[in-house]
Amino acid sequence: MVSIHICAEWCHLFLNGAVYDVPKAICFGDDKAAARILATEDVAEIKALGRLVSGYDESLWNGVRQIVVYEGLLAKFSQNSGLSEQLKGTGQAFLAECAVKDRIWGIGLSMHDPNRLDRAKWQGQNLLGYALMMVRERL
């Protein structure tokens, strides 16, 4: 396994989601997949390539992915004072990613679902919300 370090130069990858899938490919030694992901800006293609990473081990990735996203978000918000101020402006609010189809990074509920306000009724893990709150605390 290759060690992963998200450097500040990778912030542009957030524009297309590759900040998640490139380290995933690198983590499992799939340099070809990493290169193919970097060669495209098509979000759907990036996601598809990320699903095809050779040697992928879900148990291992589940332990690494939160660190990858946290480091990427920290770099992104540290380099952009406007974004940083917006995030800090949320104060102590509990942040949630309202995404019906995403039960890992989101809460599995839409922005219009009244259950979004009740954490006991969330259908997802909200890993993105937790990562954003960690970054906010660090800033």
Task: Give the predicted meaning of each segment.
Residues 1-139:
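Charged, low-complexity intrinsically disordered segments
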